[in-house]
Structures are given as structure tokens and as C-alpha cells.
Amino acid sequence: MWIKICGNTNAQDPQLAASAGADAVGFVFAPSPRQVTPEQVAAIAPQLPDDLTRVGVFQTRDFDEIASTVRMAGLHGIQLHGGLDLSLIDKLRAEFSWRQFLIQAISWQVDGDPMESEQRFLNDLGAVVRHGVADALLIDAKTTTASGGTGRTFDWKHAREVLDSHPTPVHIIIAGGLHPGNVREAIVTLRPWGVDVSSGVESQPGKKAPEILEDFIRAARFAFLEIEPGPMLPVEAPPV
């Protein structure tokens, strides 16, 4: 089980996440109400526990920009959004070897034709699995106007059926519209390796609500106890 609290903009929220039992925290370097700079994260990082995985969220395809940010901010993981670029993953793996936990986000479109959404999802899933370099796949909800971070859920039951028919050895992380009231259902339905939440534990964009965050982590932990890892759910933790 792996719980990531994303969209952090200050030192207090990731500290709270760590004390509540989160495994990782995320910092958004893409245009967003929660966007931060490498300098901000570099100042926050020394205030966090050594065993708390720090993940940077990127939408750029600029390798030099990502690599520079990783070093300056002191990150342990790289999360890529905005479509597949397998050559970028190759470059990042070559640059950082296995010192960085690489997460590739793929989307489940929640508007438009359901069959087309499923086929696009399968195409991306297959491409990443065949490529074999990413450590994890993050499944997020997508709309015609936003490729992720929508705060909307996708069809968990349908996604579970698709994943059952296309087993993958890669870690599966789910995101999109999660909050304390629905994270148990999401975990029990999809049986992922991890969950990722941002707006679902906030009092306002970029500011976490302590009670909501703690409730989310507690609900997620209890839900993970209800499921058993299947062959698609390796149990190794990402490097820190």
C-alpha cells in the first residue's frame, strides 16, 4: 500500500501528511493553483522526514528542465502527465538510473464516447507496459479540456474489468476525485498498489485540511487491509 498526498505548497502540509502516515508527498511544477518552484521545494525538503518520498509532478517535455528541477528540489520521484513520451522516460532513466521512482500518468476520459475512452486507455497502458521502464502507472480522470487534476472520478468498476483482462506487472496508482468518503470504495473496487489525492483533502487550493487529510489516510489504510495483493500488485516500496 502506498499513499501520496499531492499539491503541497508549504512545509506544514507535508509534515502533517507524514505524521498521519502518508508514504509520499507531491509537488506540482506544472501550471496549477498549486504550482511551486524548485527553490520553494528545496527550502521545504530539509524540514521533512528522510523516509518521506518527495515526488515532482511535471507536464513539460523538456528533459533539461525536469532534470534540473529534480536536482534542485531534492526529489525522489518523477510523475509525468500530459500524454506519453517514452523517449523522455528513457532519458530520465538513463540520467538517474533507478534512483528516481518514475510514475507515468495515463488517463481515463470521463466525457465523450466510453468505447473510445477505453481504447485510448488500453493503448497507453499497453505502450507503457511494453516499454518496461516506468515503475508505476497513475490512472487519473481526464476531460476534453483537462488531462488530469480534474477532481473527478472515473468508472472504477469498468477500469477494474479492463485491468483484469490486461494484467500488468507495473504498480497501479489511482487518482481523480478521491476523498475520505469514497477512497474505500475506490480501493476495494480497483485493488491498486497506491492512491494519490490532492483537492480531496484541502480546505482551499494548496492548503490541506488536517482532519480531512487524517480521515483520508485512515480510511485508505483500513481499505487496503481489506484487499489482498494480486499478481499485478508488487509490494516493494519505491526508493527514498
Per-segment meaning from a language model:
Residues M1-D50, H76:
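Basic, often amphipathic N-terminal segments
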Residues C6, V57, H81, I172-L178, ...:
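Glycine-rich beta-strand-to-loop/alpha-helix junction loops that act as flexible
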Residues A17, I78, L137, D155, ...:
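Conserved, mostly hydrophobic/aromatic
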Residues A18-G21, V70-R71, V129-R130, I187-V188:
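Non-catalytic positions within long, well-ordered alpha-helices that form the structural scaffold/packing
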Residues A22-P33, Q79-D85, A141-A146, T189-L213:
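Glycine-rich phosphate-binding active-site loops on the catalytic face of alpha/beta enzymes
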Residues F29-P33, Q40, Q47-H171, I227:
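Conserved anion-binding
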Residues E39-L48, K91-R93, S198-V240:
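C-terminal helical cap(s) of enzyme catalytic domains, especially alpha/beta-barrels
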Residues S165, H171-V188, E202:
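A C-terminal functional module that forms or caps the active site or interfaces directly
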